[in-house]
Amino acid sequence: MVQRLLLQQKTADPHPKLPGTIYTAAEEIVEAGGEALPVICDIRSEDNVRDAVNQAVDHFGGIDICINNASAIQLTNVTDTEMKRYDLMHQINGRGTYMVSKFCLPHLKKSDNPHILNLAPPLDMEAKWFAGTVAYTMAKYTMSMCVLGMAEEFKDMGIAVNALWPRTAIATAAVQNHLGGDEIMKLSRTVEIMADASYEILTKDSKEFTGNFCIDDIVLYESGVKDFTKYASVPFGELMPDFFVPDSTPLPDEIKNS
């Protein structure tokens, strides 16, 4: 399948702690057989987002899928959270998700199988997910509330709106920098599990599969995957649970044992 992707990022400058740039990501997509359009975009700017959406439509002829993955994170308590960090998390996570979805909507209506996918957690209202990280949890749950509301609002348009969240930590630079370095990476699954789960969701019938808060390994398990060792940084090793995964989430033996 040839993928045509618009990549949005605030800057083209390399980050001191995060590898690559929007342009190196585009090169990887092209090398894998896809087509990429890198666009510098501050997701907090209405003009920037509108322009990025218009560029995607002009370049590719339309929009079939909107993935809201942009997030800011700071895992601090109320006392230690500066208001500028609170504002940043809410501007990017909640407002950014809402705005990108809103501006993609007219174009998604024209697609044969339109999907919005937010990288956002289930709306599990347990106090343990809020205490100590109130600002961040509120910001991420705003993305989740977009799923809840937009799925219902867009249902008659045939536009699917779903959320995807990992059961465990994922081995990304952000996790390495914010959650504990190399040791956490050993307790994480690779990014491929989220990519594969996203593919399963985005290839479903948008009129039939919407309003779901999906967990990565459950999506893959239900699609037929029974061996998850290929996704582990250390096969059969201990995995660190991610935030926000409800205690009631099923854990089949095939997932538990690999």
Describe each PLM feature range.
Residues 1-24:
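Conserved glycine-rich Rossmann-like NAD(P)H-binding loop of the short-chain dehydrogenase/reductase
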Residues 19-23, 40-52, 83:
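The beta1-alpha1 cofactor-binding region of Rossmann-like NAD(H)/NADP(H)-dependent oxidoreductases
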Residues 109-157, 165-170, 176, 180-181:
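Catalytic loop of short-chain dehydrogenase/reductase
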Residues 163-164, 181-258:
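C-terminal helical subdomain
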